[in-house]
């Protein structure tokens, strides 16, 4: 300590016990903040930014991203928890709770003189055993719609209220089943999430097609067509400047007229090609024809297309081009040279919807769409943001379940069973590392305890009941948050993701052991030397 002080008199140093106390209090502080929003009965947090923006949430990931955390150890834990969300999409709050609890349990033994290194050895042994146990209790099953709905509901109910969660569950599962291809990874970008600020949140629905957030740019174009051909292209239908900076000089006004005509003809030829194709495929029938272009379309071209009864949308987003071809079929064209009927997609219904100043174009009734849209509705911005965060987590939960091919019982059942398995395993560990295993087992119980506490039940009483029921029946028993009584999680259809639990065990143990082994904290960066 003196050495650092000699080199840098301004350095701040915390040694041995003090360093550990600082770290443990930081972990417990963060744990106290997130403790109350675990599970379906958790409470909300209101975050007010410096500019006065308000955000209401109970999603641990959103909280940790938005909170300004000053303490270095607390921000380290927050980073680990948000990394957990990036990898698996869930488990942020559990992560913070378990790390805080591991340090709290370890602190009890360290205060009695046990060396942190011995506890960390116990933690490692316990982690290995817990992972083996997780392999035994995971339930491999056919990922049919029923199972996926249970998985999605379990995840979504922790983010939004039950009634809304049930509406979102079906939409989320059906959207994944629509975009899922055999033996290919699921690409969640193929689910577009579109917001509309009106009606109530339970009107959120799944559109088996695409919703674009702009409408046709011409007043004479039809607002609704049925049985429509869709042409997706990335071709400029407006006059563009040349790529190299060039200029034209003309001697007389006639020459200028010719030049303008030549420029117009260039674009008119492209428009004519589209119109010819429309006449070819539609004939005299009243089938619709829609052009969705990534680049611009000028007023003359819009006029010509409108006269032929073609709906044209310009400047569509690039990400929507890929979604369009997946939803409606067809091929996205970069030039109109090889324009033929095979390039066209098809949709049963295309219509424009106006909401205040905004226009939306719905492309629906597609045959077997490989890209779908979740249309979120809500009365205000807070609700929309909350639903959006929830849907993202719900989509990830369903994707994880399909990728893992297995699930584990939720409601704290796995943690209760794992703690009991670790207590039985404890005698086979040599020496004082047994205490580390005991600390790990006790720390895992924070999950069922907090679930019960947030639902308004006595946490000790509930935990004792659940443990007794588990010992008697040998089944994986969790907490029924409506009654506070034990219940078999699998029968109630409460499933968690296997990969989330696995990641939890890995990351919590690593961070808790690293924090325990810190015996000196120095704030002695270059900036503190100046002045």
Swiss-Prot record:
GO terms for cellular component: chaperonin-containing T-complex; microtubule. CDD domains: TCP1_zeta. ADP binds at residues 39, 91-94, 158-159, 411, 496. One of its GO terms (molecular function) is ATP-dependent protein folding chaperone. There is a cross-link at residue 251 (Glycyl lysine isopeptide (Lys-Gly) (interchain with G-Cter in SUMO2)). GO terms for biological process: chaperone mediated protein folding independent of cofactor; positive regulation of establishment of protein localization to telomere; positive regulation of telomere maintenance via telomerase; protein folding; protein stabilization. Disulfide bonds: none annotated. It comes from the Eukaryota. It is found in: Cytoplasm. Its main location: cytoplasm. Component of the chaperonin-containing T-complex (TRiC), a hexadecamer composed of two identical back-to-back stacked rings enclosing a protein folding chamber. Each ring is made up of eight different subunits: TCP1/CCT1, CCT2, CCT3, CCT4, CCT5, CCT6A/CCT6, CCT7, CCT8. Interacts with PACRG. NCBIfam families: chap_CCT_zeta, thermosome_beta. Component of the chaperonin-containing T-complex (TRiC), a molecular chaperone complex that assists the folding of actin, tubulin and other proteins upon ATP hydrolysis. The TRiC complex mediates the folding of WRAP53/TCAB1, thereby regulating telomere maintenance. Belongs to the TCP-1 chaperonin family. This is T-complex protein 1 subunit zeta. It comes from Bos taurus (Bovine).
């Amino acid at each position: 300590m003196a050495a650092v002080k000699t080199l840098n008199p301004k350095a701040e140093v915390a040694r041995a016990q003090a360093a550990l106390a600082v770290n443990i209090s930081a972990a417990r502080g963060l744990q106290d903040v997130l403790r109350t929003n675990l599970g379906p009965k958790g409470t909300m947090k209101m975050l007010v930014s410096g500019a006065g923006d308000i955000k209401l949430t109970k999603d641990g990931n959103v909280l940790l991203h938005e909170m300004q955390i000053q303490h270095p150890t607390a921000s380290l834990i927050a980073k680990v928890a948000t990394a957990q969300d990036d990898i698996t999409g869930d488990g942020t709050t559990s992560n913070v709770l378990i790390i805080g609890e591991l340090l709290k349990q370890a602190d009890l033994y360290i205060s009695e003189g046990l060396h942190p290194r011995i506890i960390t050895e116990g933690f490692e042994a316990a982690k290995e055993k817990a992972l083996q146990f997780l392999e035994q209790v995971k339930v491999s099953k056919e990922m049919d719609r029923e199972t996926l709905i249970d998985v999605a509901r379990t995840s979504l109910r922790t983010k939004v209220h039950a009634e809304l969660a049930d509406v979102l569950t079906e939409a989320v599962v059906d959207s994944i089943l629509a975009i899922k291809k055999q033996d290919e990874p699921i690409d969640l970008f193929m689910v577009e999430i579109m917001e509309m600020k009106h009606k109530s949140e339970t009107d959120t629905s799944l559109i088996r097609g695409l919703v674009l957030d702009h409408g046709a740019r011409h007043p004479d174009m039809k607002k609704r067509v049925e049985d429509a051909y869709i042409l997706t292209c990335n071709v400029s239908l407006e006059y563009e400047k040349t790529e190299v900076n060039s200029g034209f000089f003309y001697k007389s006004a006639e020459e200028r007229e010719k030049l303008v005509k030549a420029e117009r003809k260039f674009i008119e030829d492209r428009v004519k090609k589209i119109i010819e194709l429309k006449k070819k495929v539609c004939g005299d029938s009243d089938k619709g024809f829609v052009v969705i272009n990534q680049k611009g379309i000028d007023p003359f071209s819009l006029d010509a297309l409108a006269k032929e009864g073609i709906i044209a949308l310009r400047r569509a987003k690039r990400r929507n081009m890929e979604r369009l071809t997946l939803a409606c079929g067809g091929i996205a064209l970069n030039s109109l040279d090889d324009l033929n009927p095979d390039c066209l997609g098809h949709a049963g219904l295309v219509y424009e919807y106006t909401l205040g100043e905004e226009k939306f174009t719905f492309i629906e009734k597609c045959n077997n769409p490989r890209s779908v849209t979740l249309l979120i509705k809500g009365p205000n911005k807070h609700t929309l943001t909350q639903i959006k965060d929830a849907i993202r987590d719900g989509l990830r939960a369903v994707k994880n379940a399909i990728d893992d091919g297995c699930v584990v019982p939720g409601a704290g059942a796995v943690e209760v069973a794992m703690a009991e398995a670790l207590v039985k395993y404890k005698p086979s560990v040599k020496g004082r590392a047994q205490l580390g295993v005991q600390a790990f087992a006790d720390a895992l119980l924070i999950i069922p305890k907090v679930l019960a506490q947030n639902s308004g039940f006595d946490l000790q009483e509930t935990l004792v009941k659940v443990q007794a029921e588990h010992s008697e029946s040998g089944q994986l028993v969790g907490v029924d948050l409506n009654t506070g009584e034990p219940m078999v999680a699998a029968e109630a259809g409460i499933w968690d993701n296997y990969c989330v639990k696995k990641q939890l065990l890995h990351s919590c143990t690593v961070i808790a052991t690293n924090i325990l082994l810190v015996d000196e904290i120095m704030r002695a960066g270059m900036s503190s030397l100046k002045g």
